[in-house]
Amino acid sequence: GAVYVSGKDEVANKLSSVRALKAAKENGGKLVAVCSACYNVLKRVNNDMATDETFAYKANTYLNEGEDYHGETEVLHYLEMLRDVIGFDTIAKKVKENKENPLKGKNIGAYYGCLLLRPSKVMQFDNPEEPTIIEDFIKALGAKPVVYQMRNECCGGYVTVENKKLAQNRVEMIMSNAKTQGAEALITACPLCLYNLKENATETKLPVYYITELLAEALGIKEEEADK
């Protein structure tokens, strides 16, 4: 599920996550998510399976699929894989080979939003107040990271469905803050944030990109090549 349900009796809503985590355990023990919402749900459900015996018992009983699962899978975000498995230094070297890198010297602001960092005790993704992983990624792409106050604040999330005006106000605060600090564009790792930042921008607008889009641009990978 794309939303983590906090009620302890909401077992059924988390079974798809448990099933994915269990399958990953049986196929190498690691699960990488490109989407921050998916990452958030998988990481939190995995923690539930490891720390909440009652929930784990109910989930395993419902699934009734071979060996019980108790949170053994390591859940990673795509950014963590790029940093810790491939290495930002390796990416930076490959980027330098692209002499026509359109990102070189460009001022780009990282937008973290909520789901990558919170709840911090479970996510353990980065410093929840002063994260650096996306800024380090921006540097590896040959661009210049712009740090601004609203980068960790909520864009409105799913509230855009019921209260578009509120989401527009949130996005305006983010966009104006980033632009004031010199950002020429924003980069995010959350599809919902990407949608909100693009669709709910009103007075202040900046180009907004997904992490994989700018990675491809920096490496000189064309769209038709990426589809192969």
Name each region found by the language model.
Residues G1-K228:
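Iron-sulfur cluster-binding electron-transfer modules in prokaryotic oxidoreductases
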